[in-house]
Amino acid sequence: MRAKIVAGNWKMNKNSEETEDLINELIDKLPTNSNAKIIIAPTFINLASAVDHTEFTNIRVAAQNMHQAENGAYTGEISADMLKSIGVNTVILGHSERRAIFHETDAIISFKVDTALRHEMTVIFCFGEELKDRQNKQHFNIVENQLRDGLFHIDKSAWANIILAYEPVWAIGTGETASPEQAQEMHEFIRETVRKVFGSDIAEDVSILYGGSVKPDNAKEIFSKPDVDGGLIGGAALKADDFVVIVNGI
């Protein structure tokens, strides 16, 4: 049975003191017997502290990004080995903001995936279409292409370390809203696309998270869909009470 997962992407928020406070609040309020795997992704400078504070809890810590190279003259970058050395074994790759703001291509993201898997890290692989793609009815093609370019070259065995996170970019901060039915439609398509290439076992085992503005008031309905295995949460992950409601909705 595939894992249910709720991952909180904190983005560029929370200084060191605020990070510690939020983690302590989550430890106090999150259920210890949750059906969901719980992941938080603080900023780079707070990862080591987060790992220490969550050591004896059911909360796992992830990085928001990493560089594809092992080391070298890449000012401002962080490598997989550096993350592993402080106990971070999970990384978010291909996030829509990395693609749009920092111009990360499918090729760059694919290299990052390869590096992370080489270091036996778990990859939360993000992908999804923009508003113009959906308006032009190209959304299925875009999603399939991103999956193919980013993941379809990896070995079957590597899928044990892959979590998929579908981000409908057109429904994030645009005023547009993706319905639970639209989420299910795309998640079903994603699972069938994986099935065609890698078979039913991998397709049924891989967790597919929804990353389209999940909030306390819509989480339970979205998570009730058969191919939605949890969420990649943005703004709502920065408030402990909101995040707890979302986790309880799984």
Swiss-Prot record:
Disulfide bonds: none
Keywords on record: Cytoplasm, Gluconeogenesis, Glycolysis, Isomerase
Protein location: Cytoplasm
Location, primary (coarse class): cytoplasm
Active-site residues, Swiss-Prot/TrEMBL: H95 (electrophile), E167 (proton acceptor)
Top EC class of this enzyme: isomerase
Gene Ontology MF: a single term: triose-phosphate isomerase activity
GO biological process, one term: glycerol catabolic process
Pfam family, one: TIM
Entry binding sites for substrate: N9, W10, K11, G173, S213, G234, G235
UniProt pathway annotation: Carbohydrate biosynthesis; gluconeogenesis; Carbohydrate degradation; glycolysis; D-glyceraldehyde 3-phosphate from glycerone phosphate: step 1/1
Reactions performed catalytically: D-glyceraldehyde 3-phosphate = dihydroxyacetone phosphate
GO CC entries: cytosol
EC numbers for this chain: 5.3.1.1
InterPro entries named among the record's database cross-references: Aldolase_TIM, TIM_sf, TrioseP_Isoase_bac/euk, Triosephosphate_isomerase, Triosephosphate_isomerase_AS
Keyword Isomerase in annotation: yes
Record function comment: Involved in the gluconeogenesis. Catalyzes stereospecifically the conversion of dihydroxyacetone phosphate (DHAP) to D-glyceraldehyde-3-phosphate (G3P).
Subunit structure: Homodimer.
Family assignment from sequence similarity: Belongs to the triosephosphate isomerase family.
Cited NCBIfam families: tim
Identification of the protein by name: Triosephosphate isomerase
